[in-house]
Amino acid sequence: MNVPHHIAIIMDGNGRWAKKRGLPRTIGHREGVKRIKEIVREAKKLGVKILTIFAFSTENWNRSKNEIKFLFQYLNIFLKNYKKELMRKDIRLKAIGRRDRIDKKSIRQVKVVEELTKNNKSFIFNIALDYGGRWDITEAARRIVSDYQNKLISKEAINEDFFEQYLSLGGLASPDLLIRTSGEQRISNFLLWDLAYTELYFPQKYWPDFNTKELEKAIEVYSQRIRKFGKI
């Protein structure tokens, strides 16, 4: 089976999963967080090298304050309880996205885990927090302009490969496979630059129901596709 080097996941459907069961949306998020570790373990076991999950978008601030509060509470608990396993399994965790709008406690917890795991090499686990693809591209352009104005780079050096280094995933291979759970078929401002040639897969399962068998199925579907990258 042809296993993708890098998988990106939009974890969609937590709220609908909870509503279907007559439960609060926050319970759906809690169950969704539980699913993350299982999928990371299975991805690593199958030979995937990088996993990037969309945990909180720049647009998610439009949700209720109570829901946002619970989301970051779950994030803090998740990171605190996950540190030992990350070290034991040689997994590096990295957060991508804005950091100026997230509460200080959450950012502090993120930094602790990033620092702790920075030398781990077997697997890279990216969590997109307060992330948006348009923001990512705009921020990269802003930083390039700043470096050019400060005479750190030349105009002639700027091309696609150079620009890519300024993005949140700079230095990492672009995703080979994007999975969006819940059946919704859109990318919702996620990794806009990086998904240019990514294979897309949209299972009907809500994220809390997306288990290891579903991941294996996604990879099996991916392995049957022929990626041409514009060639015949």
What are these regions (language model features)?
Residues M1-I232:
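Flexible, compositionally biased loop and terminal segments
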